[in-house]
Amino acid sequence: IDEYMGDCIMAFWNAPVDDKSHADHGVESAMAMMARLKPLNEEIKAEADAEGRKFIPLAIGIGLNTGVVCVGNMGSDQRFDYSVLGDDVNLAARLEGQSKTYGVDIVIGANTLAQLTDKATLELDLLQVRGKTKPVRIHCVAGGKDLLEREKFLQLRETHIKMLAAYAGQRWDEAFESLDKGRKEMA
């Protein structure tokens, strides 16, 4: 963990110690956080109910990106912090914001996807990010190896790919049909 900024937690992998599986470790940490959220909310709800308070569930969105950054002690002689800076750090923050837009828990960039092993992912969109000249392809993490190996997920992914192709080609009826089919496959 690098720092807490309001309701944001910033963390990074692969520094100061090399970690060849840093993309996997980042995504696995994100998945572990999401897995812990449901029981945590159940605990908070039980406490709120026992005290007669309104229950307000905790919800989080996570953005991960992989890339080249500036890492090291930042600041002055009087005050410094070991941290990371750079475009790829900023993109991770923007991806976190997209989790709410797309209604998913974990959003990752294409560079992170390229380094993952055994994770179930779905492409979300080609997104024009403020401050970038080229759009970036974004994906969501649906689960781990267990989900990736399920026939139901593989069918859903194929339907999802067809839906995205129809959407990109502005074939709206076809895109909606694929979307409906995907919803039925998830049920």
Kindly label every feature range from the protein language model:
Residues I1-D19:
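Conserved helix-loop-beta segment at the catalytic/binding core of cyclic-nucleotide signaling proteins
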Residues I9, I60-T66, I138:
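A structural signal for short, well-ordered beta-strand segments
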Residues W13-V17, V68-Q78:
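Active-site loop/short helix in cyclic nucleotide turnover domains
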Residues A15, D19-I62, D87-K100, A120:
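Alpha-helical scaffold within the catalytic cores of cyclic-nucleotide enzymes
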Residues A23, F80-L85, L124:
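Allosteric regulatory "coupling" segments in signal-transduction proteins
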Residues A23, W172-D173:
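TPR-repeat structural position
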Residues V69, Q98-A168, D180-A187:
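Cytosolic regulatory/linker segments at or just downstream of nucleotide-handling modules
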